[in-house]
From Swiss-Prot:
Its main location: cytoplasm. GO terms for biological process: adenine salvage; AMP salvage; purine ribonucleoside salvage. HAMAP family: Aden_phosphoribosyltr. Keywords: Cytoplasm, Glycosyltransferase, Purine salvage, Transferase. Catalyzes a salvage reaction resulting in the formation of AMP, that is energically less costly than de novo synthesis. InterPro entries: Ade_phspho_trans (IPR005764), PRibTrfase_dom (IPR000836), PRTase-like (IPR029057), UPRTase/APRTase (IPR050054). Pathway: Purine metabolism; AMP biosynthesis via salvage pathway; AMP from adenine: step 1/1. This is Adenine phosphoribosyltransferase. Belongs to the purine/pyrimidine phosphoribosyltransferase family.
């Protein structure tokens, strides 16, 4: 589905770039500036609703923490459930865990064991796609619980970091509202 270029431009322009954060040589794409702009934030959610309405999804899974900011309102608008994937020890019921590689080590994510069933068709939502490690771990969690996941949506993609190729290799169809070059 083609997206309105004027709206996409508004969204992209609302994302501030912070040079040398969190370290020298990095251009940090600050999605919180988009959240501060009510018109751009609503336009973001509206575009995602337009993209995914009537596609048969039963759940949206958002990754900690900024995935919650886009996934939860999208789920509400689509009239489906929202499932948070969190860092270890943050969810109160029984969970399963999936580790993933970081630049300097490992981390892991958890999901409630009863949050996804074999009857669920799941859309994964996050603010930013960089290397794809957190979303790959999230997809593995969903599939381990029997859920069907073939789609992921991002506000920002940094294609130079390899995440798009990593996730398409998992069989995911990706929607990215904005792309930025570099790191």
């Amino acid at each position: 589905m083609a997206m309105n270029t004027e709206t996409l431009s508004l969204i992209k322009q609302s994302i501030k770039t912070i040079p040398n954060y969190p370290k020298e040589g990095i251009l940090f794409r600050d999605v919180t500036s988009l959240l501060e702009n009510a018109v751009a934030y609503k336009a973001t959610i509206d575009l995602l609703v337009e993209q995914y309405r009537n596609k048969g999804f039963t759940k949206i899974v958002g990754t900690e923490a900024r995935g919650f900011l886009f996934g939860a309102p999208l789920a509400l608008e689509l009239g489906i459930g929202f499932v948070p994937v969190r860092k270890p020890g943050k969810l109160p019921r029984a969970t399963i865990s999936q580790s993933y590689e970081l630049e300097y080590g490992h981390d892991s994510l958890e999901i409630h064991t009863d949050a996804i069933t074999a009857n669920d068709k799941v859309l994964v939502v996050d603010d930013l796609l960089a290397t794809g490690g957190t979303i790959e771990a999230t997809v593995k969690l969903i599939r381990q619980l029997g859920g069907e996941v073939q789609d992921a949506a991002f506000v920002i993609s940094l294609p130079d970091l390899g995440g798009e190729a990593r996730l398409t290799a998992l069989g995911l169809e990706l929607v990215k509202l904005c792309e930025f070059e570099g790191e």
